[in-house]
Amino acid sequence: MTESVTISLDAMGGDHGPDVVAPAALAALARNPALRLILVGQAEPVRQALQRHGGQESERLWVHPASEVVAMDEPPSQALRTKKDSSMRVSIQLVKQGEADASISAGNTGALMATARYVLKTLPGIDRPAIMSTIPTKGGYAHMLDLGANVDCTAEHLFQFAVMGSVCAEAIDGVAQPRVGLLNIGEEEIKGNDQVKRACQMLTDSPLNYVGYVEGDGIFKGLADVVVCDGFVGNVALKSSEGVAGLIAHYLRAEFQRNLFTRLAGLIALPVLRSLRGRIDPRQYNGASLLGLRGIVLKSHGGADAFAFGRAIETAVLEVRKGVPRMIDQRLESLLAAKESP
């Protein structure tokens, strides 16, 4: 019998709050009989959302009250200091207390990272947690981190990100010796800033399967299973790729609607276009992991719909079953031991 997994959901976070979280939770429970979900938030609005979507509390789904909500534009320090009973914070505290195995929020990213770090603390050997997400590539998909948690990083931080990303690729995807690439402005050794060059040397000297520098266009070529960068570069790269994908979709729609012949061509190409949309649909990859914490926390996109939020739930279940924080801790410990041994 499969062991049950309990996940706490910040029901008030994101652009749509319980109107997305409630249907996503109901659908996830229908797919996974070993799953239990806690909806954390203002009790009455959450229960009303459940009823609107044909659900109610049960042995596998219940509401945990939290009186406050962190606004999407609220400064992280203010949220951490003044919103001690926020749905975001209470959801993470349930992980800390052992009542939940993981927490998911579509709320304010900065506040989520600050709160998770304050409540759960970081793993030994990890200076800063990082945000990791999955991106589509020619070969399937890859994991990329950091995506915005750490704007300025040292070489040591980048090395720690590489270890965490490698462990996740190995645990979640079952990839033996995941290929780790360092995002840079060129593949030549002379290129890059001092932090990137030092991180490159550290990775070269490590037992990780380091494949060298990866340029921006190489992210999507499937050259690496894990792409490592600082949060500033990673966030810009991710948002730029989303913008380009949106621009291409805009051009395709405009061209197919130009005249009768292009409309007919669009109808003929519809199955191909639907398949393409499914492969690059960002909803498929929703659910960014906050790695390096003493617990599992995922960030859903603020504008996610129920399908996308459901994907984040599936990722959280997988990370719980694989014991990702424990695996990161063990891998770091073994790397440090190998480094210190003569």
Curated annotation (Swiss-Prot):
Keywords: Cytoplasm, Lipid biosynthesis, Lipid metabolism, Phospholipid biosynthesis, Phospholipid metabolism, Transferase
InterPro entries per record: FA_synthesis (IPR003664), Phospholipid_synth_PlsX-like (IPR012281)
GO BP terms, alphabetized: fatty acid biosynthetic process; phospholipid biosynthetic process
Subcellular location: Cytoplasm
Listed pathway(s): Lipid metabolism; phospholipid metabolism
EC number(s) stated in the UniProt entry for this protein: 2.3.1.274
Any coiled-coil regions, as ranges: none
One Pfam family here: FA_synthesis
Alphabetized GO MF terms: phosphate:acyl-[acyl carrier protein] acyltransferase activity
Reactions the enzyme catalyzes: a fatty acyl-[ACP] + phosphate = an acyl phosphate + holo-[ACP]
SUPFAM superfamilies named in the record: Isocitrate/Isopropylmalate dehydrogenase-like
GO CC annotation: cytoplasm
Family (UniProt): Belongs to the PlsX family.
Complex formation: Homodimer. Probably interacts with PlsY.
Task of the protein: Catalyzes the reversible formation of acyl-phosphate (acyl-PO(4)) from acyl-[acyl-carrier-protein] (acyl-ACP). This enzyme utilizes acyl-ACP as fatty acyl donor, but not acyl-CoA.
Protein name: Phosphate acyltransferase
Organism: Alkalilimnicola ehrlichii (strain ATCC BAA-1101 / DSM 17681 / MLHE-1)
Gene name per UniProt: plsX
